[in-house]
Amino acid sequence: MKFLLFLSVALLLTSFIETVTVNKAGMERPSRALVGRGCPAECPDTCSSSGSCAPDFIG
């Protein structure tokens, strides 16, 4: 049982990766993106759960 708890915590921690995105001003800024989320490259940090760009959604 402890192994399953450890495994789920490890998977949760490794599900996030650090990415660097460049905004329109050319400034690099770090953002977090879920692995395998399927967000388009033009909006990696404002992607809705459906995988489409959503300017009002911060995800």
UniProtKB/Swiss-Prot annotation:
Propeptide stretches in the record: 20-36
UniProt PTM: Contains 2 disulfide bonds.
Tissues/organs with expression: Expressed by the venom duct.
Compartment annotation: Secreted
Alphabetically ordered keywords of this record: Amidation, Cleavage on pair of basic residues, Disulfide bond, Neurotoxin, Secreted, Signal, Toxin
TM segment ranges: none
Positions carrying Isoleucine amide: I58
A GO MF term: toxin activity
Signal peptide span: 1-19
Any one annotated GO CC term: extracellular region
Note on domains (UniProt): The cysteine framework is XIV (C-C-C-C).
Name by which UniProt lists this protein: Conotoxin Cl14.4
